[in-house]
Every structure is written in structure tokens, then in C-alpha cells.
Amino acid sequence: MTIKLRFVASLALVFGLAAASVPAQASGGDTPHLQSWSFAGPFGQYDKAQLRRGFQVFQNVCVSCHTLENGGFRNLPSRAAPNWPLDEVRQLAASWPVQVKDINDKGDPMQRAPKLPDRIPSQYANEAAARIIHNGAVPPDLSVIAKARTFQRGFPWWVTDIFTQYNENGVDYIVALLNGYEDPPERFKVPDGSFYNKYFPGHIIGMTPPIADGLVTYGDGTPETQLQYSKDVAAFLMWAAEPTLDVRKRIGWWVLGFLVIFTGLLVATKIVVWRPVKKGLA
């Protein structure tokens, strides 16, 4: 078999496997709709106002069950985002309802209010305590949920995603999940204490519908709807999972610019160096 035929056969195998994988992916749950995000694409940046609203939703709704182990109060005043005033973050940490464990000057264990350098404390003493409260289940930590929970778009969309640089599967899934609660179809049995969600794999989820219209009060005039809440908290969780996204993209463009200029200089140097040699050989 020639190299060309092997290449064609390999492409056919890849596309065939991709096409065959679509039903398996779709059977786990409906495909979420794509949302519009300020941080999408190569030029995208976080919307600081949206991140603040998202943290507000997390603080008032999500934190009652979920943790944010990798999240720290010190990250909130970050110049990248959400860029909160330092004094406000200090007050926020001091008023946080869960205290942190520490050691006093005498070496005895104590509890105190969180400070700016601290991580956002967990409301559970340990995993066993979380299981007791939630009937044997442990609510997932949300630190990297926007990157860990996602969905596959299947063929041919993964091909176009290479060029559009679509990488927001996780936040699209979060928005879909928070808005996917509905009555189950006929003859679909949902166990007591569980709920039907068309976007959750298997469609049976143990989490109570967490948000509803008017649940959180915004102070900037943003619509206080379930869909808006879900978008805002999804954006915040994306920032929690990738807080340096803004910086990474800005540095990336500087690097690409440097490579373009450096490549041009190399080409020009090659022309200048080899032009006399070529003339001498002519």
C-alpha cells in the first residue's frame, strides 16, 4: 500500500470513528446550546462585572452545598479579574460564615475569621460529614468544574472548533444543566429525592434545582433571571478554573508578534548572506 493510500485510509478511519461516536455521546444527555461568552476565542477577556455577579450567585446559592477548595480570597483583587477593591475583599473574608482552623500563639488549635491570604474555607469538617448531610453523596468541588465537566460536540463540529478555537464546552454545559430541570417524559421513573434533568447524563440528578428568577439581587440593573444567574456563575467558575486566562491570551499575542518579526529577520538575514554567494555561483 502506498503512502498516499495509507493516508486516505487513516483519514477514513478517523472520520468513521468520530461519526460513530455521536449517538453514544448524545445518549448520555441532550447536547447543550452554545452561549456567547466575553472570554471566548483568541481575543476573549473576562467581563469583570459578570465575574462579580457570578461570585454573588456562588456566595448566596452554591456555597451552601459546594466547596471551592482552590479558590482564595487573595485572587479576587487580582488585576486580571475580578479586580475587586482590596478593602472590600478584606471585609468579605472577615464576614465569611465559615471560620478557618489555625494555631494561636500558645500552640493551641483555634478557629478564626478568614483573612485575605486564606483560601475560601469548606463548610464541611471532612468528607464523611458531607456524606452524612447529603445522604451519602458528596457535592463536587467547583474549583475546576468548568474544565472537568464538559460534553463532546462530535463530528463534524470538532473539526470547525479547531479553527474557531471553541473551548467553552464546560461553561455551556453548566448553563444547560442549571436550566435543564423539567418534568420527566411519560414512563420515565425518577427515584424519590431525585430530579429529571435533560442535560445530565442518565437524566437523573440528585441536586435540587438551585436557582430561580429573583433569587439573588443584583445592584447593577442586570436582569435577575434564572438564565442570567446561570451564565454569571458559569463565567465565575470558568475564572476559578483558569484565573490567568486573560494574561495568557495577552502574552500569547505578544509571543506570536515576536515570532513573526523574528521570522522576518531570519528571512532577511538569509537573503543578505546568500545573495553574494548565489551571484558568485551564477
Swiss-Prot record:
Keyword terms of this UniProt record: Cell membrane, Electron transport, Heme, Iron, Membrane, Metal-binding, Respiratory chain, Signal, Transmembrane, Transmembrane helix, Transport
InterPro entries found in the cross-reference section: Cyt_c-like_dom, Cyt_c-like_dom_sf, Cyt_c1
Main location: membrane
Superkingdom of the source species: Bacteria
Purpose of the protein: Component of the ubiquinol-cytochrome c reductase complex (complex III or cytochrome b-c1 complex), which is a respiratory chain that generates an electrochemical potential coupled to ATP synthesis. c1 functions as an electron donor to cytochrome c.
PROSITE patterns: CYTC (PS51007)
Transmembrane segments: 253-273
Segment forming the signal sequence: 1-24
Membrane topology annotation: Single-pass membrane protein
Binding-site residues for heme c, renumbered to this chain: 62, 65-66, 207
Subunit structure: The main subunits of complex b-c1 are: cytochrome b, cytochrome c1 and the Rieske protein.
PTMs per UniProt: Binds 1 heme c group covalently per subunit.
UniProt organism field: Blastochloris viridis
Protein name per its UniProtKB record: Cytochrome c1
GO molecular function, one term: heme binding
GO cellular component annotations of the record: plasma membrane
Record's subcellular location: Cell membrane
